[in-house]
């Protein structure tokens, strides 16, 4: 006979949700920082400028 599973407690649910939101906030902060870096032109570590490529054009 089928038996229903135990209900997850509100505390456990809230812990998981808080962890997920924290991780999402960190990723959003990284993305914003990366975007700012690209816009200000300080993004040499992201898109290294190859000197030879610029000369060919």
UniProtKB/Swiss-Prot annotation:
Gene Ontology terms: biological process: translation
Biased composition (Basic residues): 1-20
SUPFAM superfamilies: Zn-binding ribosomal proteins
InterPro entries membership: Ribosomal_bL32 (IPR002677), Ribosomal_bL32_plant/cyanobact (IPR044958), Ribosomal_zn-bd (IPR011332)
Ribonucleoprotein found in the keyword field: yes
Keywords: Ribonucleoprotein, Ribosomal protein
HAMAP family named among the record's database cross-references: Ribosomal_bL32
Protein name, per record: Large ribosomal subunit protein bL32
Annotated organism of origin: Rippkaea orientalis (strain PCC 8801 / RF-1) (Cyanothece sp. (strain PCC 8801))
């Amino acid at each position: 006979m089928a038996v229903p599973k135990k209900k997850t407690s509100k505390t456990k649910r809230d812990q998981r949700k808080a962890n997920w939101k924290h991780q999402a906030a960190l990723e959003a902060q990284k993305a914003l920082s990366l975007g700012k870096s690209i816009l200000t032109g300080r993004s040499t570590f992201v898109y290294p400028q190859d000197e030879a490529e610029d000369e060919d054009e």
